[in-house]
Amino acid sequence: MALTLARPEGNGPGGGNLALFYLETRDANGALNGIRIERLKDKLGTRKVPTAELLLDGVPAEVVIGTRDGTRHIAPMLQITRAWNSVTAAAFMRRGCALARAYAHERSAFGAMLAELPLHRETLADLETETRAATLLAFELVELIGREEAGDIDDANRALLRLLTPIAKLLTAKQAVATVSEAIEAFGGAGYVEDTGLPALLRDTQVLPIWEGTTNVLALDAVLRTDAASGLAAMRARVAAALNGAPAAVAGAADLAVRALEHAEAWLAATKDRNALQTGARRFAFTLGRALELALLVEHARWALVRDPVCDAVQTARRFAATTIDFIRDGDHGG
């Protein structure tokens, strides 16, 4: 079965006049049910998931709900697929890190194992930090979706879910491309050889900022949404909860997360020009996402220290805090 958007006869142009339909892709004999494959697309990656141009001619289909507003009705599915995208991004990052770390303990250079070279260790630590941040953000989104599906979510968390969905998807996807690329570079020339499987990992990762809404589309979704204020209030509350009781060792990181979030909120409140909002949408979304990631790393450090006083969670939070968290440009409010 499949769900598809189509324009019922008599409906005018525009996305609002599309309807959501249910159809069965094969008939009782197992043949395609009025669906003709025009061509398979020759893609950069994800070749195990074929993409095709299809012609639907005489396919039996049933309207799911109403004959208009199909895009709005299909939105819950987009929420799930964007969460999948975020989790996949974290998974690809973890695989890249694991491979690079394992290789560092097998490959020697300059008379020592790569894992013993200070600069290589620093590089691997940076990759690990981004991976942990992305993982925490992805599963923050997963938790909110789980609460919504279980009927155990209040209005504030529902607003946070709506805002976090595009932000988590766009940020983790960007982090994945950068992290996997760097992890492959850690193999040197071997990372560029097809039979290692590493180039395929990079190609598959590259689709993540494209699938389920590009970075620009999702950034605009975050900044222009009518309920942005309630979403920001909920995010502020979530950050405050994450930072409550933060260990002294990560107090600076906690303060940075708060200041970045406040800066983004102030920019949104001061920016009335729609063109300026669109111009700054990426910086706004990246700031919200990385501020929340930093807060989640601080929260994790607090939790981890109770269980293992010598864990590296504090160092991870502090390392992440040393990266760019606040992307907002002062004075970029338009006229």
Regions inferred by a protein language model and the residue ranges of each:
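Generic, well-ordered alpha-helical scaffold segments in large soluble proteins
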Residues: 5-8, 21-24, 55-63, 77-80, ...
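A short core secondary-structure module
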Residues: 1-34
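C-terminal helix-coil-helix/basic helical segment that borders enzyme active sites and/or dimer interfaces
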Residues: 132-169, 185, 265-281, 299-311
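Alpha-helix capping/hinge segments and adjacent helical runs
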Residues: 162-238, 307, 319-335
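C-terminal amphipathic alpha-helical interaction region
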Residues: 238-335
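A glycine-rich, basic-preceded beta-loop-alpha segment at the flavin cofactor/substrate interface
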Residues: 26-34, 38, 43, 50-81, ...
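N-terminal leader/propeptide and maturation segments of large enzyme subunits in energy/redox metabolism
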Residues: 120-131, 138, 147-154, 244-253
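Secondary-structure capping and boundary motifs in well-ordered enzyme cores
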Residues: 45-48, 82-85, 116, 120-133, ...
